Amino acid sequence: MAAALRRGYKVLRSVSHFECRAQHTKPSLKQEPGLGFSFELTEQQKEFQTIARKFAREEIIPVAPDYDKSGEYPFPLIKRAWELGLINTHIPESCGGLGLGTFDACLITEELAYGCTGVQTAIEANSLGQMPVIIAGNDQQKKKYLGRMTEQPMMCAYCVTEPSAGSDVAGIKTKAEKKGDEYVINGQKMWITNGGKANWYFVLTRSNPDPKVPASKAFTGFIVEADTPGIHIGKKELNMGQRCSDTRGITFEDVRVPKENVLIGEGAGFKIAMGAFDRTRPTVAAGAVGLAQRALDEATKYALDRKTFGKLLVEHQGVSFLLAEMAMKVELARLSYQRAAWEVDSGRRNTYFASIAKAFAGDIANQLATDAVQIFGGYGFNTEYPVEKLMRDAKIYQIYEGTAQIQRLIIAREHIEKYKN
């Protein structure tokens, strides 16, 4: 483990029993004789959860409203998360990282999102940017680009979406042409999280101009240094929610990239880009659950304090039933991301469960944020109270990393295919 990470863990409590090895990061749905599985977390998972929870409640929540209003990038919080080992959790131990599984990353993500999903998204975007390198990079690429992120707080970004190609990834127009030992990239990317803060990018390009070539062979993925000549970073976008997250457009104009920065080889980019989602969609779902849990907690506390018609809100059946519905939804959404994470950590293809988790948790986050505002009444519509921010922040969970509708297409395809086979 990197020295900085060791120092970070000592900040909150002694965790000398942490060995941070992959075999110690099994999901909570572990096999038990006679029962089949258990919901009990390992001691290490409980430690990670405690550290993340303490950080979110004591350091993120107090400043989240200010970051939301200013739109300032939360680098002090990101640096602190890096010191505590709550960022770059997927990076292999061979590159100086913790080598945690998806399940463990989800536990951390839920806690961070409870504090502020804008901060959590800035952190989680690193995992998305890193994932193509983690699953498809060679040893040299991993050590060079992942290793540097364990040495100091550093960001990366996943550059796939374009102005005219969001859900239709196969419709991207950014091109890469091979010229000698280099590739020349030209095109534009849009809505790139960490776009203006990244040290390097994963960039998906069309390397075969023939429209008849299938997507599985037409695209190539590159690692591109952010300071490469020809890269032009656009203005920071002012979004409806998650405002402290850095979202920008990026233009590539005759950007030269060495052939050593190709992941796997020409034509492998589409599979790499899509494969990354199987590992990151569970954590996105976990972020949505963190927001949903916050909405439930805020609504419940308010209903226990606010009186109307001579009694507490919770004493009105309509409100208590609404809280019950909210509680059911958040518990089921949590189980959905845990199942998706458990599947991939167990070495199984989890596309079906990852899409279920992403779609369901994203919808639940929006429903619970709306319900929380309703319970707060007029106060919920005011910026002095936390739930209006939750409602604004929640919407993006139905859009980024695959819209709610795209997830349903994937779920339907996977479901029907099972019956065909």
From Swiss-Prot:
Q: Residues that bind FAD, according to the entry?
A: 158-167, 191-193, 306-308, 316-317, 374-378, 402-405
Kindly list the cofactors needed. FAD
Q: What Pfam families has UniProt attached to this entry?
A: Acyl-CoA_dh_1, Acyl-CoA_dh_M, Acyl-CoA_dh_N
| Residues binding octanoyl-CoA | S167, S216, D278, R281, R349, T351, E401
Segments crossing the lipid bilayer: none
- As listed in the record, the transit peptide stretches over 1-25
Of the GO CC terms on this record, one is: cytoplasm
What keywords were assigned to this record? Acetylation, FAD, Fatty acid metabolism, Flavoprotein, Lipid metabolism, Mitochondrion, Oxidoreductase, Phosphoprotein, Transit peptide
UniProt lists the family membership as follows: Belongs to the acyl-CoA dehydrogenase family.
Oligomeric form and interacting partners = Homotetramer. Interacts with the heterodimeric electron transfer flavoprotein ETF.
Question: What is the protein's given name?
Answer: Medium-chain specific acyl-CoA dehydrogenase, mitochondrial
Question: Which species?
Answer: Rattus norvegicus (Rat)
Question: Could you read off the lineage of the organism from its UniProt record?
Answer: Eukaryota, Metazoa, Chordata, Craniata, Vertebrata
Q: Which gene is the coding source of this polypeptide chain?
A: Acadm
